[in-house]
Amino acid sequence: MADEQFPAAATALEEYQSIEEQMASPEVVSNPDKLRKLGRRHAELGAIVGAYKTWLQVKDDLAAAQEMAGEDADFAEEAKRLEAELPGVEEKLRTALIPRDPDDARDTIMEIKAGTGGEEAALFAGDLLRMYTRYAEKRGWSVNVQSENTTELGGVKDVQIAIRAKGTPAPEDGVWASMKYEGGVHRVQRIPVTESQGRIQTSAAGVIVFPEADEDDDEIEIDPKDLKIDIFMSSGPGGQSVNTTYSAVRMTHLPTGITVNMQDEKSQIQNRAAALRVLKSRLLAMKHEQEAAEAADMRHSQVRSLDRSERIRTYNFPENRIVDHRTNYKAYNLDAVLDGDLQAVIDSDIQADEADRLANQQ
């Protein structure tokens, strides 16, 4: 049988068809959370199923052409063409079967923190926030600022945002599939606006990213007894009050010590719900890290401290140059990158990751 060569693909096809049946049932259609989860898995299997069906078709067509080749020169020619095409089709299927990051289709929580460099580092953190916001807009994603502390000069001390796709994207088009490579220390070299001598200064900002958990994510269960919740007044630039009510929330998960601050929603209830979702996302990331402790997952390559030596990328303004130190990607279009033209940089990381996964499969 055809599926004996790729049993994993045959199993994926069966699951894919089963999910399609479930998604058509009234019970699932009326449950958005269930529909979203099934849709994510459906999209994840789609690439495998598509490659598998193509392989089956080429195999069947080749067998038919070979059977008729002795009687018809056209079939003989077709058999040669299909025989040459088959290895490439098989390779695409093998690649599709390489396990993806199960979180690729998820949305993403991102934190940007000013590091060494004082006010200049805060201004650069603001530049990164604008860069990611504009990149998200180009991808058709939404950006929701969940908490933000700014400086009097318009810099960003720290900010937390949620980047979300519309609908249920295929894993390769998910927010996490691209944004997971942004975690680490980003270094900037430029003449600060506060520098009167025209000297180039080096400063840094740290970026931490983790996949966003679903509101009803059953992978993570939080006991209310494990939560400490503090309520305080929201504050803006320079400590100014955002509103006159105590609506901001600080949520601490006692077993792990993880703390989440949320103040940008309109009410305390909304801030509590948003904080809980971010906390679940952090715990989900921690769980996945523990499960993949032997592999180089996202947290292993992210910020351990905001020291400039742990850089993953350098933004050199005098030369209009950007360098990704993990892939040796280099380009002289920094102005465009900061305006959201980030895809080529991210693609270099995706390609390096795919090459590593291919090598590990062999």
UniProtKB/Swiss-Prot annotation:
An annotated GO cellular component: cytoplasm
Location relative to the cell: Cytoplasm
Signal peptide per UniProt: none
Post-translational modifications reported in the UniProt record: Methylated by PrmC. Methylation increases the termination efficiency of RF1.
GO terms for MF: translation release factor activity, codon specific
Superkingdom per UniProt: Bacteria
Modified residues (N5-methylglutamine): Q240
SMART domains: PCRF
Pfam families: PCRF (PF03462), RF-1 (PF00472)
Keywords: Cytoplasm, Methylation, Protein biosynthesis
Keyword set includes Protein biosynthesis: yes
Function summary: Peptide chain release factor 1 directs the termination of translation in response to the peptide chain termination codons UAG and UAA.
HAMAP family per record: Rel_fac_1 (MF_00093)
Membership in a protein family: Belongs to the prokaryotic/mitochondrial release factor family.
Protein name listed in UniProt: Peptide chain release factor 1
